[in-house]
Structure formats: C-alpha cells, structure tokens
Amino acid sequence: MNYFDNKIDQFATYLQKRNNLDHIQFLQVRLGMQVLAKNIGKLIVMYTIAYILNIFLFTLITNLTFYLIRRHAHGAHAPSSFWCYVESIILFILLPLVIVNFHINFLIMIILTVISLGVISVYAPAATKKKPIPVRLIKRKKYYAIIVSLTLFIITLIIKEPFAQFIQLGIIIEAITLLPIFFIKEDLK
C-alpha cells in the first residue's frame, strides 16, 4: 500500500467509527475516496501538461464541456486507469493542440457538432455494466443531455473562435463515447 492508500484507509476507518458504518458502508466510503484521489491525480497530470504546452484554457474548456454533457449522457469508460490517462491525454491535450496548430474549418466543426448532437439525441444516456442507469432516470437524463448539448452548441454560434471550437470539440468527444461500438465488447462478457 502506498502513502495515499494508507491515509484513505485511516480516514475511512475514522469515518466508520464516528458514524457507526457497517463494513459495506466502510468499503463504499473507502472506494469513493480512492476514486476521488485517482481522479484528482489524473486532473493534476492532465492540466500540468496542458499548462506546459500553453493550452491550459483550451483543455479546460474542452474538458468542462465534455463533463457538463457527460454527467447526463454518461458513456463508455476506459478499461483501466492507465488507459484513462492515455485517452485523457489524447482527447484533452492532443486534440486541442491539433485545433490550435492547424486551423480547422469552421463549417467542418459545425457539421461534426451537428452530427454529434444527433448521436447524443439517439444514444444518450449510455449506461455501462459498472454504471447502470435506473430506468426512472433515463428519460430525464436524455432530456438534460440534449438540452445541455444544444445550449452549448448555441453558445458556439455566438462566441468567437477559437473558444467555440473547443466547446464543439467537447461535444464531439462526448458523443463519440456514446457510440454503440464501445459497448459491444462489454455486452459479450
């Protein structure tokens, strides 16, 4: 166990004793803290790289757009923590770098975003085996995913480049994670 795991265990044990948590609740609290710690670590790595490459704001805009839609639309996850790092760097560092260094035609980005809105309308919310969505929430999540995506798209029509393109990129990335091709392997297990 590393230093952070020990601290998480100590804090989870403290919470268990203080709040009379049973063993299952203790495990849930500990898992939640472990996931939070890993995600914070990934964000620190990703945003540090973005800062070094002088694209911090663009990475932030892309990532926030992605997150605002994803909290309602859900979507595919990387199979491991390592692949999550790799995918995050590709999607939120390399793709914004491509947009910064190679002017992507405004019309192409609009077309890709409109296609992405269609994908979100059809496939959101996309549950996974590890993160199922309760049936009672599906309609509401679909509605919010569409509303948030459309609102962000309308904002891109009002604001100037390059910021509009990074919002569009976030919409496109989230739409890709909803495609059924990412769930075939999971369904076969």
Curated annotation (Swiss-Prot):
GO cellular component: plasma membrane
Keywords attached to this entry: Cell membrane, Hydrolase, Membrane, Protease, Quorum sensing, Transmembrane, Transmembrane helix, Virulence
Molecular-function GO terms, alphabetical: peptidase activity
EC number: 3.4.-.-
Bilayer topology term: Multi-pass membrane protein
Cellular location(s): Cell membrane
EC primary class: hydrolase
One Gene Ontology biological process: proteolysis
One Pfam entry name: AgrB
Transmembrane segments: 49-69, 81-100, 110-130, 143-163, 164-184
Major site of localization recorded for this protein: membrane
Family: Belongs to the AgrB family.
Function of the protein: Essential for the production of a quorum sensing system signal molecule, the autoinducing peptide (AIP). This quorum sensing system is responsible for the regulation of the expression of virulence factor genes. Involved in the proteolytic processing of AgrD, the precursor of AIP.
HAMAP family, sorted: AgrB (MF_00784)
Name of the protein in its database record: Accessory gene regulator protein B
Source organism: Staphylococcus aureus (strain NCTC 8325 / PS 47)
Taxonomic placement: Bacteria, Bacillati, Bacillota, Bacilli, Bacillales
The encoding gene: agrB
